[in-house]
Amino acid sequence: MKDRMNKFKEKVVLITGAGKGSGRLLAQAFAEHGSLVAANDISPINVEEVVRQIIAKGGRAKAYVEDIAKKVGVQQIINQVEDDFGRIDILINHAAVEPHVPLLDMDEWDWHRVLDVNLTGAFLMTQSVGRLMRVQGSGVIINLITESIADKNWGAAFIASMSGLEGLTHQAARELAPHGIQVYSVKNLSETVAERVFALLDLQMEER
């Protein structure tokens, strides 16, 4: 624990979908390790509650309420985080919508909204943060991916978005590596997600 505190102290960590689920767990975990947490969510109630909890425990965090499915919202987040903290060391793409709607019952709006948030949002965040990290010469981007195919309750749009996010992760890793930016995917299981993320980052830091 102490070794990790030294590794992650003062690191600026931007987490999308930080208001609930794995995003909330990771925001709290990074704050406990001394990181500066930039917590994004579309719900001001959820994300501001997370930030209050972190600050109450002596951590440092700030809420950023924007819709990451829209480019203007993404750019607002990046600009504000850069103004507040000066850089972004780690980006975690967690924001996702998860409608359990059968293919034959899903309307076009739901289809587009799922892909816009789960896939396009991750693309926009990766692109915008990646440009900042390129200037910095380093950074880590982690995409949390649900292994949706194994769960028959997920809808077609969600499964398509997770498959697309896996492909985006692989290609982003190839393109961004020359700029000192590492891109990974981590299985999104709330019980173990924090340990998986920290184990990955521990290994990544040892290899540098």
Enumerate the language-model features and the residues they cover.
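Canonical Rossmann dinucleotide-binding motif of NAD(H)/NADP(H)-dependent dehydrogenases/reductases
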Residues: 8-37
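Active-site loop of short-chain dehydrogenase/reductase
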Residues: 11, 59-60, 87-88, 133-146, ...
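Conserved Rossmann-fold SDR core element
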Residues: 30, 87, 141, 166, ...
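The beta1-alpha1 cofactor-binding region of Rossmann-like NAD(H)/NADP(H)-dependent oxidoreductases
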Residues: 44-45, 65-77, 108
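Substrate-binding pocket helix/loop in short-chain dehydrogenase/reductase
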Residues: 102-103, 110-115
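A short, exposed helix-loop element centered on a Lys and neighboring polar residues
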Residues: 126-127, 170
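Catalytic loop of short-chain dehydrogenase/reductase
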Residues: 142-164, 169-170, 174-177
